[in-house]
Amino acid sequence: KRCVAIPGDKLEIIDGLLYINNELSKLPYRAKPLFKYRVTSQNGISSKELLKLNITGFSRKFKISGINSNQQFEAIRPYISSLISSDIENFIITSGHKGIPSRIIAENRLRVTEIKEREKIISMTNSDFEKLESKKTFDSIYRIFKTTKSYNTSFFPNDIMYDWNEDNFGPIIIPQKGQEIELNKQTLP
């Protein structure tokens, strides 16, 4: 976390980008904000290829055959992000970018096949995006952000009157000494 505005500034987030006093904020060179991208490929997206590029903000989908005991399930449980199908013959899970360790697969005599998805949502930095785009192996890569106006009580001022979210927020004015605000139904959050 860092200070991005000072008293008297107007702060606003538009399409995931920070604006201070109506100007796009220039982040320090060390700042590496993550954005969500939708990546598509008719040939499927290789997790191994993403990992070679040191891109890790994605999930993987696996089909697991041969699960016939609680012991096997308990062995892979720590690596499961979500369970898509619990059918013994068609057991499908998602995991983090590291997947399921080969040692766990071998010890439990599981048959694990990664499902090569045609679309992935990937969290990555601008430099990761440039690396991925330069590969020319994907049909499309585009940044996604919340554009629909729907209120979210997780975000200040936690009021249905404001349709703010993590990608579109504000504007708000950072109070400064001596500033006066008329208190009424519109100015009280």
Question: Which ranges hold each PLM region?
Answer:
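Soluble "head" domains of membrane/secretory-pathway proteins
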Residues: 1-189
